[in-house]
Structure formats: C-alpha cells, structure tokens
Swiss-Prot record:
Pfam family, one: Glycos_transf_4
Assigned protein family: Belongs to the glycosyltransferase 4 family. MraY subfamily.
GO cellular component: plasma membrane
Membrane topology category: Multi-pass membrane protein
Keywords, in A-Z order: Cell cycle, Cell division, Cell membrane, Cell shape, Cell wall biogenesis/degradation, Magnesium, Membrane, Metal-binding, Peptidoglycan synthesis, Transferase, Transmembrane, Transmembrane helix
Catalyses which reaction(s): UDP-N-acetyl-alpha-D-muramoyl-L-alanyl-gamma-D-glutamyl-meso-2,6-diaminopimeloyl-D-alanyl-D-alanine + di-trans,octa-cis-undecaprenyl phosphate = di-trans,octa-cis-undecaprenyl diphospho-N-acetyl-alpha-D-muramoyl-L-alanyl-D-glutamyl-meso-2,6-diaminopimeloyl-D-alanyl-D-alanine + UMP
EC assignment: 2.7.8.13
Protein name as catalogued: Phospho-N-acetylmuramoyl-pentapeptide-transferase
Organism listed in the record: Caldanaerobacter subterraneus subsp. tengcongensis (strain DSM 15242 / JCM 11007 / NBRC 100824 / MB4)
Amino acid sequence: MIQKIIFATLLSFTVAIISGRFFIPYLRKLKFGQKVREDGPKTHLKKSGTPTMGGIIFVVATFLTSLIFSPWNKYLFILLAGFLGYGLIGFADDFLKVYFKRSLGLRAREKLLAQFLLAIVISWFIKSNVGTEIIVPFFKRSVDLANFYIPFAVFIIVGTVNSVNLTDGLDGLAAGVSTIVMAFFAMIALFLNDVTYGVFSASLTGGLLGFLRYNKHPAEVFMGDTGSLAIGGAVATVALLTKLPLILPVLGIIYVAEAISVILQVFSFKLFGKRIFKMSPLHHHFELSGWKEEKVVYSFWLVTLIALFVSFYSLS
C-alpha cells in the first residue's frame, strides 16, 4: 500500500508540473485573468490579470492519478463527488468572473444553494456507507450522531469549503496549507490500511505540490474558486469518511481562523460600527500590519505543520 501512495504522490506531482507548463500560457492566451478587488490591500493591485482557474491543474492530476492507483469502489466515487462536484461549482464561478470581467461570479445565494444541495447528497452517501459514528480527538472515544449526522456533515462540508475559499488570498497560502492537511489524511489512511483514502489523499498532496511550483510568490497562476472549492470538498469528504471531522478545527486551524476572522469582522462592524481587524480574512490583517506576503504564508504553513503533529497526538 505504501508503494501505491508514494507512486500516486509522484505521478500527480509530475502531471501537475508538466500540465502547468502548457496550461498557464493557454489561460493567458484566453485572457482568463483575475480581476483583483479594489477594496483589498493595495499591494495586490499589481496581481490583476494573473491567470486564474489554475486549480484545474491539480484537479486533473488528482483525478487521473486516483483512477490509476485506487480501487474503483463506492468510496472513491464519494471522494470524487465531493472533490469534482465542488470544483465544478467553483469553475462556474470563475468562468463568470473572467467572461464578464468582474471580481464576482455566481451570486452568493446561487453558490450557497449549490453547495448545500451537493453537501446533502454527499452526506447521505457517507452516512449510508460508513455509518453515523465520529471519533472525538483527545478523548479516545467515538460518538454516534444518529439522526443528527446529516445536518452535522452538511455543516462540516459547507463550512470547510468556504473556509478554504477564504484562505486562498495570498500566493501559495491555500495550496501550502492544504498540502499539509491532505498529507495528514494520506498518513491516516496508512494506519487504517485503506488504499482508496490513501491514494486519493496522496494524489491531491502531490498535485498541490506540483501546483505550488507555479502558485508560490510571485504567483504565475491562481487556483481560483475551481481549486479552493475542490480542495474544501476533498478535505471535508475524506474527514467524514475517516470519521475524523472533529480533527478539522485542530488540523485546519488556519481555515478556521480565516473564517472566524471574517465572521467577527462582519458582526463587530454591524453591531458596534467598529472593525476588530485591519482587514479580513486574517491574512490581510497581518499584511496591513507590515508583514510581507511571504512571511504570512510561511508562518501559516508552519502553524499548520505544528497542527498536524498535534492532530496525531490527539489520536494516539
């Protein structure tokens, strides 16, 4: 099994590296450039026009590698449904942005409706195939959610998808953090002796590493919602299948911090007319506090790496 995981990581990495060399110039030719928000950090305005929808690079690499090395079973179908399904929602959003040359694609209501409907379907399949028990980290026990499982799973999926999306705001940030997160699940799959979960997680890990070659600062391409929503769908789905959704607040501490910073900022401004952060999500607060973009990114990677070890400890 470990050989399959290693080969899956290497193949997906290679596919992402090679495909990126051809796909990024093609995106430039199509003029699929990202329109940067004018109300964001001024240092980001120079990034306007950078090709977006680059998430296709690691989505395709992960999909092909998973088909090659993983058994074709219902669990792979569920993983790919979460991964590709949310990737398609993101693709639709990205396409509308670049086609109409605007910073917003799908309406928020449309995007959320699609996310919730897909989450309900995926949650039902997970419940039907792995049951309703989840593991509680640090306490070495499991809890049966019974009839509360589907609402809980829907919350986990939609919450994770949007949290990853919020994290994707700096060069290499979401890709690097998510590489570490998916590497964790690849290692968990080794302990579970589950080839399907292991190959899929390793494939996405390798694909993201290859994508980082082009997404690190200064980024040649952005993953767009195509990539960030696909990652969120993958992270949430594999966490639920392995019965480890409660590990996400620890392992995905950066995702959680980014999302909470936005929620707190909105509530504080609406209730008190004051902002807690200089700008949200959290990574922009650090930028406006004088941190260089690379320092923010590397610091968030380091926090996630520490969170990985804490997550393993919580399950030991």
